[in-house]
Curated annotation (Swiss-Prot):
Keyword Nucleotide-binding among record annotations: yes
Family the UniProt entry places it in: Belongs to the heat shock protein 70 family.
Gene3D superfamilies found in the cross-reference section: 1.20.1270.10, 3.30.30.30, 3.30.420.40, Actin, Chain A, domain 4, Substrate Binding Domain Of DNAk, Chain A, domain 1
A GO term for molecular function: ATP binding
Residue span of region Disordered: 608-640
Organism field: Anopheles albimanus (New world malaria mosquito)
Protein name as catalogued: Heat shock protein 70 A2
Keyword Thylakoid included in the entry's annotation: no
InterPro entries referenced in this protein's UniProt entry, alphabetically: ATPase_NBD, Heat_shock_70_CS, HSP70_C_sf, HSP70_peptide-bd_sf, Hsp_70_fam
Gene name per UniProt: HSP70A2
Lineage: Eukaryota, Metazoa, Ecdysozoa, Arthropoda, Hexapoda
Family matches, as PANTHER family: HEAT SHOCK PROTEIN 70KDA
Record's keyword terms, sorted: ATP-binding, Nucleotide-binding, Stress response
Length: 640
């Protein structure tokens, strides 16, 4: 059976793993890196994903897209998105209330939904796994922050579909990390484990009870879907923009390229400060020819981000109170996510737990993908001893309910309820002879629906006339294992029934949208492939030219007539000039040039080789000059 993979789709980096031969393999990409930047770049000639996209970001800041996870499943007017737009060099536009990313690609203006950008990253992860496994991959488990709401989960699932994946399950990142921890450590007995997951863009805290290393039960979860390493980078960037303004009276914030180079340097400095107490920033010709050399101490960095670091403790307190536990009942504190390497974050957490030592034994960058790979193996029926007894019980991160008279939020499913779960309540009409009811579904913790998030609504009509309070309307909430909600309403007297899967219609892609994006993704993939083939043909032609020119200086070349020598030299120079002037040519054009060059030069080179070898030799015009030839046909001759 083809392997199912686990993908950690991160804000800044993504990671993919597969469970085989009794263990998880985290798969390195084509650059040899076990994590891949969640970046997609568009240029005049091509689309780049991952390391290649991040490496060229300073040259092409406005068309290099990242942070799609901070956009996915949100509305354009979300205050978080409005704040982020100040930091992003790419353009985000409002498309009927949804954020879309606008870029220039191959000379045209294009807009992409966040799901499409995420799907491109997922495609890269899928291809990374396929290259390693040597077979095509269809099934995947994708992780999301535990605190992602319904629409963010749906949108992530859609991104998987656009990438051509069958998303077997959406699982929570801290839960996946707990799986990695529990299986890696062979835990005995019952242990309460707190997962503290601070990544590039999101923050989660989950408390689980792990029993005998096989039953993983989430007791509570809390977090902030908009807090992570990028926010720390932003603080450092703002600090240096001010310093530059003070020192040189110039404003970096108006220059996208300079800002991007500064951000890259800040990200590097932040990492340095996790192991050193001081970091140096050196950027040549940052703006208007000014070389910018400066330093930042760990203490200064901690002061710049102090409120953000402290804010990580609130979700810890909330999770403890929801799980009805005190600090002393936590056995293990497990750190996940690259930002947990920051010493101040560690010391704040350790002090909160009265000096209890933190568990640093799992790889914070890979733990989530590891757990996702295990869950993928479980769901695809892998009977390996290590995982066959594993049972994962997760919870709903937010309360779910409907609006009742006066705008009150009436909850059917409380937050931190086990999933999957189903709850039914009976409601009635508010007025005499009311012909129908409007069911409005919300998620959130506030008492009034206006303060919570509307997920969707539908009408149940055809209720027989009756005094208020008499009709019995049965509303059922069914929350599946992905944390996605189905709602049904039934009038008990007439038997009329209506149900919806909450699709958050204002925010969710329709099936038609998804189908269109799937075919576009296929088109982009084919274009990428054509681009690769054209580059290969160009390189082959160029190499052939240089090999020919080298042969003119090689041994035996003095036996060539001046006319022949000039012919080869001129044709090579002419071809190289053509290559320089036609960098966007198709593969066929390069191949045609190759054939023309070979037609003129091969006979001359054959002559050269025969003379060099002191007489006629069996040769093949297709194999001259370092193995590059344009002609097809036999490449050997019979020798008498």
């Amino acid at each position: 059976m083809p392997s199912a993979i686990g993908i950690d789709l991160g804000t800044t980096y993504s990671c993919v793993g597969v469970f085989q031969h009794g263990k998880v393999e985290i798969i390195a990409n084509d650059q040899g890196n076990r994590t891949t930047p969640s970046y997609v770049a568009f240029s005049d000639t091509e689309r780049l994903i991952g390391d290649a996209a991040k490496n060229q970001v300073a040259m092409n800041p406005t068309n290099t897209v990242f942070d799609a996870k901070r956009l996915i499943g949100r509305k354009f007017d979300d205050p978080k998105i409005q704040a982020d737009m100040k930091h992003w060099p790419f353009t985000v536009v409002n498309d009927c209330g949804k954020p879309k990313i606008r870029v220039e690609f191959k000379g045209e203006r294009k807009t992409f939904a966040p799901e499409e950008i995420s799907s491109m990253v997922l495609t890269k992860m899928k291809e990374t796994a396929e290259a390693y496994l040597g077979q095509s991959v269809k099934n995947a488990v994708i992780t999301v922050p535990a605190y992602f709401n319904d629409s963010q989960r749906q949108a992530t699932k859609d991104a998987g579909a656009i990438a051509g994946l069958n998303v077997m399950r959406i699982i929570n990142e801290p839960t996946a990390a707990a799986l990695a921890y529990g299986l890696d450590k062979n835990l005995k007995g019952e242990r309460n484990v707190l997962i503290f997951d601070l990544g590039g863009g999101t923050f989660d805290v989950s408390i689980l009870t792990i029993d005998e290393g096989s039953l993983f039960e989430v007791r509570a979860t809390a977090g902030d879907t908009h807090l992570g390493g990028e926010d720390f980078d932003n603080r450092m960037v703002a600090h240096f923009v001010e310093e530059f303004k003070r020192k040189f009276k110039k404003d970096l914030s108006k220059n996208a390229r300079a800002l991007r180079r500064l951000r890259t340097a800040c990200e590097r400095a932040k990492r340095t400060l996790s192991s050193s107490t001081e970091a140096t920033i050196e950027i040549d010709a940052l703006m208007d020819g000014i070389d910018y050399y400066t330093k930042i101490s760990r203490a200064r960095f901690e002061e710049l981000c102090s409120d953000l670091f402290r804010s990580t403790l609130q979700p810890v307190e909330k999770a403890l109170s929801d799980a009805k536990m005190d600090k002393s009942s936590i056995h293990d504190i497990v750190l996940v996510g690259g930002s947990t390497r920051i010493p101040k974050v560690q010391s704040l957490l350790q002090n909160f737990f009265a000096g209890k030592s933190l568990n640093l034994s799992i790889n914070p960058d890979e733990a989530v993908a590891y757990g996702a790979a295990v869950q993928a193996a479980i769901l695809s029926g892998d009977k390996d001893d290590k995982i066959q007894d594993v049972l994962l019980v997760d919870v709903a991160p937010l309360s779910l309910g409907i609006e009742t008279a006066g705008g009150v939020m009436t909850k059917l499913i409380e937050r931190n309820s086990r999933i999957p779960c189903k709850q039914t309540k009976i409601f009635s009409t508010y007025a005499d002879n009311q012909p129908g009811v409007s069911i409005q579904v919300f998620e959130g913790e506030r008492a009034m629906t206006k303060d919570n998030n509307l997920l969707g609504q539908f009408d149940l009509s055809g209720i027989p006339p009756a005094p208020r309070g008499v009709p019995q309307i049965e509303v059922t909430f069914d929350l599946d294992a992905n944390g996605i909600l189905n709602v049904a309403a039934k009038d008990k007297s007439s038997g009329k029934e209506k149900n919806i899967t909450i699709k958050n219609d204002k925010g969710r892609l329709s099936q038609a949208d998804i189908d269109r994006m799937v075919s576009e993704a296929e088109k982009y993939r084919e274009e990428d492939e054509k681009q690769r083939e054209a580059i290969a043909a160009r390189n082959q032609l160029e190499a052939y030219c240089f090999n020919l020119k080298q042969s003119l200086d090689g041994e035996g070349s003095s036996k060539l007539s001046d006319a022949d020598r000039r012919t080869v030299q001129d044709r090579c120079d002419e071809t190289l000039r053509w290559i320089d002037g036609n960098t966007m040519a198709e593969k066929e054009e390069y191949e045609h040039q190759m054939q023309e060059l070979s037609r003129v030069c091969s006979p001359i080179m054959t002559k050269l080789h025969q003379q060099a070898a002191g007489g006629p030799q069996p040769t093949s015009c297709g194999q001259q000059a370092g193995g590059f030839g344009g002609r097809t046909g036999p490449t050997v001759e019979e020798v008498d």
